[in-house]
Amino acid sequence: MTTRKIQQIIQGQPASDGAGVKLIRSLGSANHLRADPFLMLDAFSSENPDDYVAGFPSHPHRGFETVTYLLDGHMLHEDHLGNKGNLKSGGVQWMTAGRGIIHSEMPQQENGRMRGFQLWINLPAREKMKPAGYRDIQAEEIPTAPFADGSVKVIAGTYEGTKGPVQGGSTDPLYWDVQLNAGKTFEEKIPATHALYIYPFEGSVEIEDRVLKAHQGGVLGSGDTVSARAGKDGARFLVLAAKPLQEPVVQYGPFVMNTREEIEQAIRDYQNGVLAV
């Protein structure tokens, strides 16, 4: 057993996206910090409707996957394929942009708390131009596995025999929401083949003598085990792991490809109305 250590701490930065939705961006911030194959992680949380009510009007994507996990609130997804999905508290929308998708995510509430995450996962070159896809995962489809000192909500991958609704795929992702009691330790094997990113959003965790506070992401190094100890107030954190692609990444806004020429083609396709054909 080799326990992973934190290689890099990424401080989440205030940002806005869509039509002015306020959020905290760790991966994918202005300095383009990434953790292959993870391109971006945004966290949003507010009870002020001015921070979120304008939502994310219609916009394009190409070349990667987006995962929206809503802790609290209600959003409506619509796309050019005719998909329409209500994302409610505890639910997930897993969207594969592939060769192209044009979609919107709009709040369906005028007050109350809106809280959640959006994660971008890169696709390998061979899959960047595959047909777009969309999956709406309701809260009741996502299992929670209790253990002595907390619980794990399993969105993707498997935790101690509990399988999440998302399995396999080119990067074989793990996406866990871990709740850990104060002063207790979460220890679990993570495939040595996978990159690992830990993101606490409540409380703090200590990993091999380094502390991650809320909205500080930790890129962990090589090994096959993660060991995280909750601080005095307990902790809730995301465990994100996946196989690195080790391919060139060229990004321009909502397009993520392997070369500048492919980005230029994506822009032309969008301008000519054929991005998502």
What are these regions (language model features)?
Residues 1-277:
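Jelly-roll (double-stranded beta-helix
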